[in-house]
């Protein structure tokens, strides 16, 4: 647990530094760094999004602001989070990210929760040239898209499920039952498990 937390902190710090090096609009301003995202606060994705993702965004902004904000060219700037409820709906999620990157013109974006939402939004991040680091998406299809502004942070289905099957076999398991969600994440993991 400590090792994964340490890795997450290191990845987050690297992502922030990388994003800041790519986002020139940050250097042209002196006000707050405007960071936008859409996340499920209602609907079926809420459980995952509100446990594994949005609390981390809020904690990051709170802790950075407590230290004076993000240092941009030696000047500390506070973080201003601009967030919306994507209502666990792909169309709402896509429209919201178009607004954040297109008309709101936030300095940085944080990704939505889940493989499906990231799959839908990743091409937008590429079009608007916003670095997009996805901590809650895994999909071979996302890898195959080869989007230069989109970065997956999770292991992909085949290596994960192979390790799971090996562990279960080593512990003497003979049968495995699997319940999965009928979406990109569930289908790809189940397909990898069947191989």
Where are the regions a protein language model picked out?
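N-terminal secretory signal peptides and thylakoid transit peptides that target proteins
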Residues: 1-17
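Short, solvent-exposed loop/turn and secondary-structure capping segments
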Residues: 46-50, 93-94, 121-122, 144
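Short, well-structured alpha-helical segments in soluble
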Residues: 87-105, 167
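Extracytoplasmic ligand/sensor domains, especially the bilobed periplasmic-binding protein
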Residues: 55, 106-195
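Sec/Tat-exported extracytoplasmic proteins
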Residues: 39-42, 60-68, 101-104, 113, ...
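C-terminal segment of N-terminal export signals and the immediately downstream linker at the start
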Residues: 24-38
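Extracytoplasmic "Venus flytrap"
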Residues: 36-60, 84-90, 113-116, 181-187
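Signal peptide-proximal N-terminal region
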Residues: 55-80
């Amino acid at each position: 647990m400590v090792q994964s937390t340490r890795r997450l902190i290191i990845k987050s710090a690297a992502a922030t530094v990388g994003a800041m090096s790519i986002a020139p609009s940050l250097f042209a301003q002196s006000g707050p760094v405007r960071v936008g995202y859409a996340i499920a606060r209602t609907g079926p994705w809420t459980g995952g999004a509100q446990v594994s993702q949005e609390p981390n965004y809020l904690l990051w902004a709170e802790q950075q602001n407590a230290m004076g904000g993000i240092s941009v060219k030696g000047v500390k700037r506070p973080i201003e989070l601009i967030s919306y409820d994507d209502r666990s709906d792909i169309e709402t999620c896509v429209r919201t990210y178009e607004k954040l990157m297109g008309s709101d013109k936030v300095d940085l974006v944080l990704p939505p929760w889940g493989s499906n939402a990231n799959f839908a939004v990743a091409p937008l991040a590429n079009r608007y040239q916003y670095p997009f680091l996805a901590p809650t998406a895994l999909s071979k299809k996302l890898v195959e898209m080869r989007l230069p502004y989109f970065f997956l942070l999770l292991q992909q289905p085949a290596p994960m499920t192979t390790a799971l099957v090996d562990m279960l076999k080593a512990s003497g398991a003979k049968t495995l039952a699997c319940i999965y969600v009928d979406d990109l994440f569930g289908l790809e993991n189940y397909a990898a498990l069947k191989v």
